[in-house]
Amino acid sequence: MHSPLQTQQPEQRCWPMTSTVSEIEEVLPDEDSDRTTLLNGEPLRRRVSGKSPVDEGPRRIFRQQSFGRDIGHAAAETYLITGLSFKLLRYLGVGYRWMTKLLALTCYAMLLMPGFLQVAYSYFFSKQVRRSIVYGDQPRNRLDLYLPSNNDGLKPVVVFVTGGAWIIGYKAWGSLLGMQLAERDIIVACLDYRNFPQGTISDMVTDASQGISFVCNNISAFGGDPNRIYLMGQSAGAHIAACALLEQATKELKGESISWTVSQIKAYFGLSGGYNLYKLVDHFHNRGLYRSIFLSIMEGEESFEKFSPEVRLKDPVVGKAASLLPPIILFHGSSDYSIPCDESKTFTDALQAVGAKAELVLYSGKTHTDLFLQDPLRGGKDELFDDIVSVIHAEDNDGLTKDSLAPPRKRLVPELLLKLAREISPF
């Protein structure tokens, strides 16, 4: 990679938290499981090799019950999202820009549909995907886990916060990344969180922080290494994750009660993120996310400073808390017009100015969707993917060896459709 940052092994281990354990047990058991852990007096199941024929009957019943729960949950979420969509339309009113974006988004999705269908099939039917694990008590406080196929030791973990303009984010948007990283022996936890108008930015940051806490305190029950947890966000998710990380560091500096610490995060990866709301509000307005909506999402202009990580670093207390942050690597395409790459440049400068370990990686000619969608769907070599994996496996010689021998990722969408999608992408 472009001189990847070296990270130190944190000394603090993650210990089990005491919430939503029954929900973990509902979704975790599979054909390769064994009772090994107790949280809050209830058994969890740790993934191990081997099967027990005696358990086949209960497992069959469980799978039937799990399918029923999935159907019920899907119906409930569909009803919820439909209602929120109509509420959002009332906020948006009639506007040329956002209607044009909606039409472009529809065409964009249709062009990439061959790849989306393949990913969706794996998402719903792969045994390596654990969907909708509850991590909190608020709506959409759920996460998806993408697990490697082998169980030879504890795996590094990526907590991923999806993008979606703070409005259309959903945990399944990270499914392609999750599946591809799982092929490299990396567990991925894709967080869902309340979007606008169901919640505003403070709700989103709270949800993300609670999801990170859940992973830190429970991932060992799923075969994850609690001392090798990486945080990643994309687009709006990068902004939300950065806010959560900086807020947690500030709380830690002040000695406040916390359920996870920034020292438990090995590194933060920010992909195509925006970190200064003052500079983004007019930019988004011109691209169809109208100023009135943006102000509603961000709880008014008076909250811009609080939710602008770049600006917050100017506060002496927050600047001091930045010394607690893990190494930060910001990735951005130089041709990103949705969120200009200057957002990552100036945030990197601000972090370095207060002594934080920060690095910027720019990809020449790449757009907002090239890095996260078109390139992964194209298959073969992918600079961003290789850069992320090289950091995660930097201290794992076996992992680096396996990476060098890994077969090229398969193409999911024909090149012609990818080029057309790039031209009409609304992002």
From Swiss-Prot:
Question: What ranges does the record give for the region Disordered, renumbered to this chain?
Answer: 26-59
Give the EC class as a word.
hydrolase
Subcellular localization is given as: Endoplasmic reticulum membrane; Golgi apparatus membrane
Query: Which GO-annotated molecular functions does the record name?
Result: prenylcysteine methylesterase activity
Protein family (similarity comment): Belongs to the AB hydrolase superfamily. Isoprenylcysteine methylesterase family.
Domain of life assignment: Eukaryota
Q: What positions does UniProt annotate as the active site of this protein? A: 235, 336, 368
What GO cellular-component annotations does this UniProt entry give?
Answer: endoplasmic reticulum membrane; Golgi membrane; membrane
Query: Which of this chain's residues are annotated to bind substrate?
Result: 163-165, 234-236
Specify the protein's topology with respect to the membrane: Multi-pass membrane protein
Protein name, please? Isoprenylcysteine alpha-carbonyl methylesterase ICME
Give the primary localization class: endoplasmic reticulum
Q: Which reaction does it catalyse?
A: [protein]-C-terminal S-[(2E,6E)-farnesyl]-L-cysteine methyl ester + H2O = [protein]-C-terminal S-[(2E,6E)-farnesyl]-L-cysteine + methanol + H(+)
Expression (tissue specificity): Expressed in roots, rosette and cauline leaves, stems, flowers and siliques.
Q: Does the keyword Membrane apply?
A: yes
The species this protein was found in: Arabidopsis thaliana (Mouse-ear cress)
Further facts: Plants overexpressing ICME exhibit enhanced ABA inhibition of seed germination and ABA induction of stomatal closure. Plant silencing ICME exhibit a reduced ABA sensitivity in seed germination assays.
Sum up the protein's function in the record's words.
Catalyzes the demethylation of isoprenylcysteine methylesters. In vitro, is specific for N-acetyl-S-farnesyl-L-cysteine methyl ester (AFCme) and has low activity toward N-acetyl-S-geranyl-L-cysteine methyl ester (AGCme). Acts as a positive regulator of ABA signaling. May be involved in the demethylation and inactivation of isoprenylated negative regulators of abscisic acid (ABA) signaling. Carboxyl methylation is a reversible and potentially regulated step in the post-translational modification of prenylated proteins.
Name the InterPro entries on file. AB_hydrolase_fold, BD-FAE-like_dom, Carboxylesterase_B_AS, GDXG_lipolytic_enzyme
Q: What keyword terms does UniProt attach to this protein? A: Endoplasmic reticulum, Golgi apparatus, Hydrolase, Membrane, Transmembrane, Transmembrane helix
EC number(s) in its UniProt entry? 3.1.1.n2
Please report what switches on or represses expression of this protein. Answer: By ABA, osmotic stress and salt and heat treatments.
Residues that span the membrane, as ranges:
102-122, 157-177
